[in-house]
Amino acid sequence: MVLYFYNKINRSFGLMILLYFFRSGGLAFRISELFLIFSIPLFALLINELSGVNRVLMFFILVYYISIVFLRRIYVHVVFGVNTFLPYKPIFDSYL
């Protein structure tokens, strides 16, 4: 649906909407981490579209995004906070 309206709105605004809704799968971040490679070209297109102060501001937002998403530990479970290679084992142990 977003791609249907993508041609009718400003390109920078459309890229920001795609980046905003890209991380909507918060608890299932192991699945969505596979698709992070698509966020890099989106940020590159967005920074290329902007100019001046907006480009500097978007660059700092990009650095903040990278520091939160890429530099966190992947094997820590979101809900239980357990550092394990088998991230869903504590979930099944708590329910059984």
UniProtKB/Swiss-Prot annotation:
It is found in: Cell membrane. The keyword Cell membrane applies. Its main location: membrane. GO terms for cellular component: plasma membrane. It is a multi-pass membrane protein. The chain crosses the membrane at residues 27-47, 50-70. It comes from the Bacteria. Keywords: Cell membrane, Membrane, Transmembrane, Transmembrane helix. This is Uncharacterized protein HI_0870.1. It comes from Haemophilus influenzae (strain ATCC 51907 / DSM 11121 / KW20 / Rd).
